[in-house]
């Protein structure tokens, strides 16, 4: 199996790339970070530190790398059996032209073996969005051929992979938690789905996408935002603070009530899933900074993301949402010198005031009860900070 993976960052190396390599794939990473590419090509392997109750070091072997702007990438797409990505939602649109070029070359070469493309991003149906961008760069004739021979497979991914420790001398080493989940839409493959240990097939992907978004992502973000307000440095410090934990768990239970209603999840199993996630946030071996996890607050406060989407579900089913609203107010309070979206958030709050700013960012009606509620909690948070 020939595999091409876009994004040789920590998630690419520590999660998706690792599973592909473990499945015996001939794996090539595509990235723009030249020192990283050089190191991968020189060593052909790297180490993954899996940390948790039982820490272990696993070696990933037989890998190579190419620059994602190079002609080699196009040639690799023409030959590959599977193409995956972990580049971040913003970059996905940027690699579409390259993917399209690779598919055109594949067609020209008469390669009709099935190819499956799987975007492994923190977004809902990311591969379907990638497909739209790719199709925008294809003629109608090419589109017809691609529809026949190429599967665009949506997925949900979950593994906490913090940035490398400062002072780590090995550019390729990566640290990951023990837990990992990669769930793919089994209905979207062309040909037989590849056998990859750790990749699970489902015919109800949206249930898993929302379960992860409404629990892991919602909980992680609110832990970061409340943690920063309380002066904590890491996610672990924040979740061990009883006041933070109570709101985070409350928010996950509120979003969980939406999932239970929407997808008929078993309430006891879902409660166990929430507790599992809380214990992952407590992992003492993952030094995950609240400022990093809170980054891009405008995206995280948008209508389809981890804070507003579950809130909309609670409104749809007339369910409680106080903890989610507190999380939204905490997201409005996020500050970071390093993050452009945090700066933009501050500007919007100053120019429009909290009510109009939240309405603009989230698409919630400015005069709605939840916006009023969020603004009142936000104002109380700001007053507390001022004292």
Curated annotation (Swiss-Prot):
<dbReference type="GO" id="GO:0005829">
    <property type="term" value="C:cytosol"/>
</dbReference>
<dbReference type="InterPro" id="IPR013131">
    <property type="entry name" value="Mannitol_DH_N"/>
</dbReference>
<dbReference type="InterPro" id="IPR023027">
    <property type="entry name" value="Mannitol_DH_CS"/>
</dbReference>
<keyword id="KW-0520">NAD</keyword>
<dbReference type="GO" id="GO:0019592">
    <property type="term" value="P:mannitol catabolic process"/>
</dbReference>
<dbReference type="GO" id="GO:0008926">
    <property type="term" value="F:mannitol-1-phosphate 5-dehydrogenase activity"/>
</dbReference>
<dbReference type="InterPro" id="IPR023028">
    <property type="entry name" value="Mannitol_1_phos_5_DH"/>
</dbReference>
<feature type="binding site">
    <location>
        <begin position="3"/>
        <end position="14"/>
    </location>
    <ligand>
        <name>NAD(+)</name>
    </ligand>
</feature>
<dbReference type="InterPro" id="IPR036291">
    <property type="entry name" value="NAD(P)-bd_dom_sf"/>
</dbReference>
<dbReference type="InterPro" id="IPR013118">
    <property type="entry name" value="Mannitol_DH_C"/>
</dbReference>
<dbReference type="InterPro" id="IPR013328">
    <property type="entry name" value="6PGD_dom2"/>
</dbReference>
<dbReference type="InterPro" id="IPR000669">
    <property type="entry name" value="Mannitol_DH"/>
</dbReference>
<keyword id="KW-0560">Oxidoreductase</keyword>
<dbReference type="InterPro" id="IPR008927">
    <property type="entry name" value="6-PGluconate_DH-like_C_sf"/>
</dbReference>
<dbReference type="Pfam" id="PF01232">
    <property type="entry name" value="Mannitol_dh"/>
</dbReference>
<dbReference type="Pfam" id="PF08125">
    <property type="entry name" value="Mannitol_dh_C"/>
</dbReference>
<protein>
    <recommendedName>
        <fullName>Mannitol-1-phosphate 5-dehydrogenase</fullName>
        <ecNumber>1.1.1.17</ecNumber>
    </recommendedName>
</protein>
<comment type="similarity">
    <text>Belongs to the mannitol dehydrogenase family.</text>
</comment>
């Amino acid at each position: 199996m020939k595999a091409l993976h876009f994004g040789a960052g920590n998630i690419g190396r520590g999660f998706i790339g690792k599973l592909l390599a473990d499945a015996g794939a001939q794996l090539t990473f595509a990235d723009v970070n030249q020192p990283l590419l050089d190191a991968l090509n020189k060593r052909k392997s790297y180490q993954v530190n899996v940390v948790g109750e039982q820490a272990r070091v696993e070696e990933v072997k037989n890998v190579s790398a190419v620059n994602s702007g190079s002609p080699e990438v196009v040639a690799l797409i023409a030959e590959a059996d599977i193409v995956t990505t972990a580049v971040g939602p913003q970059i996905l649109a940027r690699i579409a032209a390259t993917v399209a070029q690779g598919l055109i070359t594949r067609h020209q070469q008469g390669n009709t073996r099935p190819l499956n493309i799987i975007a492994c991003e923190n977004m809902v149906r990311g591969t379907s969005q990638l497909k739209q961008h790719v199709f925008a760069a294809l003629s109608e004739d090419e589109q017809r051929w691609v529809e026949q021979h190429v599967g665009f497979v949506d997925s949900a991914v979950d593994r906490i992979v913090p940035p490398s420790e400062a002072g780590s001398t090995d550019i390729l080493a990566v640290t990951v938690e023990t837990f990992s989940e990669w769930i793919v839409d089994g209905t979207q493959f062309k040909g037989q789905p590849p056998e990859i240990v750790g990749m699970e097939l489902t015919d109800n992907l949206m249930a898993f996408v929302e379960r992860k978004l409404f629990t892991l992502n919602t909980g992680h973000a609110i832990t970061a935002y409340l943690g920063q307000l309380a002066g904590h440095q890491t996610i672990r410090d924040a979740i061990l603070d009883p006041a933070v934990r109570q709101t985070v768990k409350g928010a996950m239970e509120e979003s969980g009530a939406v999932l239970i209603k929407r997808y008929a999840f078993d309430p006891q199993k879902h409660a166990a899933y929430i507790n599992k996630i809380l214990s992952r946030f407590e992992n003492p071996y993952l030094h995950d900074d609240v400022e990093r996890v809170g980054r891009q607050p405008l995206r995280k406060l948008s209508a389809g993301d981890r804070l507003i989407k579950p809130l909309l579900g609670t409104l749809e089913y007339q369910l409680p949402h106080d903890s989610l609203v507190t999380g939204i107010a905490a997201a409005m309070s996020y500050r970071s010198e390093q993050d452009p979206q945090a700066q933009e958030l501050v500007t919007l709050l100053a120019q429009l005031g909290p009510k109009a700013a939240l309405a603009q960012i989230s698409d919630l009606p400015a005069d709605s009860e939840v916006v009023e509620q969020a603004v009142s909690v936000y104002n109380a948070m700001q007053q507390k900070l001022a004292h």
